[in-house]
Amino acid sequence: MYKRLFISHVILIFALILVISTPNVLAESQPDPKPDELHKSSKFTGLMENMKVLYDDNHVSAINVKSIDQFLYFDLIYSIKDTKLGNYDNVRVEFKNKDLADKYKDKYVDVFGANYYYQCYFSKKTNDINSHQTDKRKTCMYGGVTEHNGNQLDKYRSITVRVFEDGKNLLSFDVQTNKKKVTAQELDYLTRHYLVKNKKLYEFNNSPYETGYIKFIENENSFWYDMMPAPGDKFDQSKYLMMYNDNKMVDSKDVKIEVYLTTKKK
């Protein structure tokens, strides 16, 4: 009897370890934020333009690519060219841990996400690829990677975004993806891109909204990202985008998206 009990405990421990260590990060439950948990745009005195550019027309996007190098054990480097502005031809993708990097190393993947340049570091080996233009030919991002094979839809799938302004559902619109499993980062980018264009979510100096967060709901689980910068006079793009480093994914057929905004009091 004791032997069977011991074996059962061992099996349970290994099962828990497997769950904790698995690199496939899907939606996990997170309580809705309390008002005092959210950043307030009125407390940010820097340029909101530095947030806006993360969700404007320029982002990293590549289909069916494979990593060419690795700087640190938790990142991968891809040969991806900026076809719009010509600002980079190599992209460093940083993950939360080694397991995630190993999961996608040497596999064909799709990459989509917001990128930054300041404090973007590459290995000397990758820098040498670009010789004298090293500082101008690279960019960095966090997560945003999905396996290419077996993850494509025959046609784009629409996901409805419901926008609540001061508690009222004043707007709904669709974002689209052709992926079965899609990163929250990709859907977040598409949502904010729409709101920047149509609701002036971020302007040059500030925002017409005091607080905002985007919420992803999948079955009974939900999680959210704060849409405003932290208090202060400077905005660190790298630090802000780090929230995507777990490469969190959702199922495009099940996920629901809600945005909660509060306007500034006049």
From Swiss-Prot:
Q: What is the lineage of its organism?
A: Bacteria, Bacillati, Bacillota, Bacilli, Bacillales
Going by the entry's taxonomy, the superkingdom of the source organism is recorded as: Bacteria
Disulfide pairings: C120-C140
State if Disulfide bond is listed as a keyword: yes
Report the SUPFAM superfamilies cross-referenced here: Bacterial enterotoxins, Superantigen toxins, C-terminal domain
Family annotation (InterPro entries): Enterotoxin, Staph/Strept_toxin_CS, Staph_tox_OB, SuperAg_toxin_C, Superantigen_bac, Toxin_b-grasp_Staph/Strep, Toxin_bac
The molecule here is called Enterotoxin type B
Molecular function per GO = metal ion binding; toxin activity
Q: How does this polypeptide assemble, per the annotation? A: Interacts with MHC class II molecules composed of alpha/HLA-DRA and beta/HLA-DRB1 chains. Interacts with T-cell receptor beta variable 19/TRBV19.
* Subcellular location(s) per record: Secreted
- One family from Pfam that matches here is Stap_Strp_toxin
Q: Which family does it belong to?
A: Belongs to the staphylococcal/streptococcal toxin family.
Q: What this chain does, per the record?
A: Staphylococcal enterotoxin that activates the host immune system by binding as unprocessed molecules to major histocompatibility (MHC) complex class II and T-cell receptor (TCR) molecules. In turn, this ternary complex activates a large number of T-lymphocytes initiating a systemic release of pro-inflammatory cytokines. Also causes the intoxication staphylococcal food poisoning syndrome.
Signal peptide limits: 1-27
* Additional comment: Lacks the zinc-binding site found in other members of this family, such as staphylococcal enterotoxin A, C2 and D, thus it possesses only one MHC class II binding site.
One GO cellular component this record assigns the protein to is:
extracellular region
Identify the keywords attached in UniProt to this record, alphabetized.
Disulfide bond, Enterotoxin, Metal-binding, Secreted, Signal, Superantigen, Toxin, Virulence
